[in-house]
């Protein structure tokens, strides 16, 4: 019966693990809904500021802002990598790393260097092992970060761009499609392309007084980049919680299946033990007779 006791101990251990994964699933589901709400609230701001930039830039076409001008000879590029601080979220980070590295290899093939700014401890650990030139790291942002938390890392990258140390800035992050699907992607932040269709067909119900739109454009462009990075961080948190919820749900279900299998093995072992004991009793009784 020692084997049956061992199986019973395993079942008890797996049940305890199942309780933990179930609790983590519920916590992740609650955090995911909150992250989705924050993501939805931040999107209109980013969309509106992009339209205003297009309008202001079009009104001063004679003033080509460096953030709107494509540089001819690209010698070095920068990447802002948005990852998580914690694990247990399936392949969320791994898939992002693969997408980012695939994009980076295109530049490496042309002998173009890269600088990285990383958000999240998982990304920092990976790219330091990978050998990337990590300029700055932002971690421990929590589940509800503020814009101020990412301003520092954005400033590092913009300073590099202003000094012409890098000629383009990209951001690698996860896009929230739905609860089951998170899509890793890399998109360009700078130089920024203005929305020409919005400028040509849009209706503007405001004017600028005094006419300091050049300074306004400078400020708006910086705020826009900050809003894009912040939006990416918020969206990545929603992706993280969704992926963790699904991973913990799968772990809970797998634990249940394993418990059922162990119970079947336990019952067979217990039955075999009882049968053996009965056989021994019968054999002993027969020997006495």
UniProtKB/Swiss-Prot annotation:
Entries under SUPFAM superfamilies matching the protein: ATP synthase (F1-ATPase), gamma subunit
Biological process terms in GO annotation: proton motive force-driven ATP synthesis; proton motive force-driven plasma membrane ATP synthesis
GO cellular component: plasma membrane; proton-transporting ATP synthase complex
Any single Pfam family the record assigns to this protein: ATP-synt
Keyword terms of this UniProt record: ATP synthesis, Cell inner membrane, Cell membrane, CF(1), Hydrogen ion transport, Ion transport, Membrane, Transport
Source superkingdom: Bacteria
Subunit relationships: F-type ATPases have 2 components, CF(1) - the catalytic core - and CF(0) - the membrane proton channel. CF(1) has five subunits: alpha(3), beta(3), gamma(1), delta(1), epsilon(1). CF(0) has three main subunits: a, b and c.
Family the entry assigns: Belongs to the ATPase gamma chain family.
Function (record text): Produces ATP from ADP in the presence of a proton gradient across the membrane. The gamma chain is believed to be important in regulating ATPase activity and the flow of protons through the CF(0) complex.
Protein's name in the database: ATP synthase gamma chain
Taxonomic source organism: Coxiella burnetii (strain RSA 493 / Nine Mile phase I)
């Amino acid at each position: 019966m020692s084997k049956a006791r061992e199986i019973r101990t395993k079942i008890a251990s797996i049940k305890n693990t199942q309780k933990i994964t179930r609790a983590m699933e519920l916590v992740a589901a609650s955090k995911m809904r909150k992250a989705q709400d924050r993501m939805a609230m931040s999107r209109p701001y980013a969309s509106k500021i992009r339209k205003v930039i297009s309008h202001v830039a079009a009104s001063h076409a004679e003033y080509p802002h460096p953030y709107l001008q494509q540089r001819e000879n690209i010698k070095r590029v920068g990447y802002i990598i948005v990852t998580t601080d914690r694990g247990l979220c399936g392949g969320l980070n791994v898939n992002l790393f693969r997408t980012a590295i695939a994009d980076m290899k295109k530049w490496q093939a042309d002998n173009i260097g890269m600088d990285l700014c990383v958000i999240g401890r998982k990304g920092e650990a990976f790219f330091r092992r990978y050998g990337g030139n990590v300029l700055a790291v932002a971690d421990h942002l929590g589940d509800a970060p503020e814009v101020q938390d990412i301003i520092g890392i954005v400033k590092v990258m913009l300073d590099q761009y202003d000094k012409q140390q890098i000629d383009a800035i990209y951001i690698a992050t996860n896009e929230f499609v739905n609860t089951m699907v998170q899509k890793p992607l890399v998109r360009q932040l700078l130089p920024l392309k203005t929305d020409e269709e919005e400028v040509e067909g849009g209706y503007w119900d405001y004017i600028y007084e005094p006419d300091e739109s050049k300074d306004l454009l400078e400020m708006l462009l910086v705020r826009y980049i900050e809003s894009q990075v912040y939006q990416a961080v918020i969206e990545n948190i929603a992706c993280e919680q969704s992926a963790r919820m699904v991973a913990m749900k799968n772990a809970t279900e797998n634990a249940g299946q394993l418990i059922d299998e162990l119970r079947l093995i336990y019952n067979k072992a217990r039955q075999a033990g009882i049968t053996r004991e009965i056989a021994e009793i019968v054999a002993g009784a027969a020997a006495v007779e």
